[in-house]
Structures are given as structure tokens and as C-alpha cells.
Amino acid sequence: MTPKKITGKILFFSDIDETLVNTDKSLSEENRAALEEFLARGNIFVISTGRALSGACNLLKRLGLYGKENLLVSSSNGAIVYDTYREKELLRRPVPRELMIEAFDLAREYPIFIQTYTDTSVVAEQDCESLQRYLALQQLPVEFCSNIRDAKIDPPPKLLCLDFFHPEKITQFRAFFQEKMRGRLDCFQSNPYLLEIVLPGVNKGTSLRFIAEQAGIPIDHTVSAGDAENDLSMILAAGIGCAMKNADDALKVKANYVTEHDNNHAGVAEILNRFCL
């Protein structure tokens, strides 16, 4: 049964890549118009992404969305919640330094490429072709260190393993990592080439519940939209969890609604118009 339109104040969580924006990272006029009308009615719109905060904010500035009232960013899969209008952090749940070091040791042992973050850049021990592709996509700078133990950085929001050329290696390392860490760190894939590593309990769903509670919005007045495995927690947490037409099949079977249009044809506007406007 298709959910009904919500009346009253609404919290909307949307993934960015392959959800809100087109594959070329542009924002359709249909999505822009629906999003602006949604905000004009006093609702809260959250960009919920695996991207690091600086990368997410850079994209929002390019799209002309940064700094709008009631537009928040939940970055690094929920590790940081940031108000772009007030330019203020509302939540930060970083990976402890000792666990970061242990994760780097495991990746080095395997071996697989791993990186972490400061508030403004990627931090890595070595260069590789996958890293350069990632930096170009995310438009982020990189800082290199000989060993992460010597890096003078704060506990990071997340770690990331990546391999754009051998995705099967990501899947294999995931099983190895989960066995070694035994619940001390969580990991999941945002796409076949990326393995996100965060503190247990950090995910898009817990971020949705946190913001809903802070804003005094009941869960049945929350909507989420996504396409990939790291979106599943917010699909399940929201009152109306929506999977894009282009989403993974595993996400579609768990969603309350699957869009008729994909991310390149204003699927988020479809959700906003059907349930929120």
C-alpha cells in the first residue's frame, strides 16, 4: 500500500549521489523547485551522505544550496551533523585514534588502500590511482604521512577503503575486517568500490532519529530517499522510506515506496510532490 501524504512539519533525508543529483552531479530544475518549496513551508531538509563534510559542503555550494535555512548536512554516514545556515556542528561521533591506527594496520597487512580525513582534506599514507580518481570526484585535497601513527590529526569521522579497479577486493576485505574488529568498528559499502568504516551505531538512520528528536518531529513525519546499501538504515528508520528507481534491489524490497523516476529524471521531486507538498 502506498503511504499517504504527510500534513504538518516534515523532516526529509536525502542521499546526494545517484539520488538527489544527476549522474553528472548537477541538480535538475524539478528537484530544485520542489526542494525550495519544501523549505519555504518551514520543513527541514537533510543532505545525508557518506561524503566527508568538506566535500559535501563544496558540492552544496556549487549547487547553490549551501546556507539555506533549515538545510542540514549529515556527513560521513551520520558521524557529523552540520547546520549550513548557522555554520554550526550539531553532532560529531568520531573514530577513536587507537581504532583508526588499528584499522590502518589491518589494511596494510591485507593489503588494501585506506584513507581518513581531517575537516578539510583526505589523509593517506601512500598515493595510488584509485585515490587520485576519488580526489577528482570529491574535489578534495590530500595530505600524505609516512605512517598514520605520526599524523597530527584529530579523531576522524570515518575511514575509507577504496579500489576502483578490483571491487571484489573490497568485499573480501570487508569480511576480514569484520572478523578482526569484532564490533569495535562498523563497516558497510556505499558502492562496490568503497568500504566505509565508522564507529558502531553511526549510520544514516541514527542520524535521522537524532535530528527528528532535536527538532521535535515525530518519526511518522519523516521521509528518506536513497539508492545504496549505506542508505538502508535511514530507509528503515523513516516513517516513509523511499528507494530510487535506480536503487539496489536489496533496498527496494525494504522501502515503503519505489520511485517511478530515477535520479536523472527528478526522482526526489517525485517523492516530495507525492508525500510532502
Regions found by a protein language model. Name each.
Residues E29-L131:
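Active-site phosphate-binding/coordination module
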Residues E69, N77, M181-G183, A237-A238, ...:
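Short, structured coil segments at secondary-structure junctions
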Residues L106, Y110-A225:
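Conserved acidic, metal-coordinating active-site core of Asp-based
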Residues T23-L27:
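Conserved ATPase-coupling elements of RecA-like P-loop NTPase cores
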Residues M1-I16, A33-A40:
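Non-catalytic pre-domain segments flanking phosphatase-related domains
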Residues I16, G50-R51, G226-A228:
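Active-site metal-binding loops of divalent metal-dependent hydrolases
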Residues T2-L11, S28, E196-L277:
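Mg2+-dependent phosphoryl-transfer enzymes with acidic/Ser/Thr/Gly-rich catalytic loops
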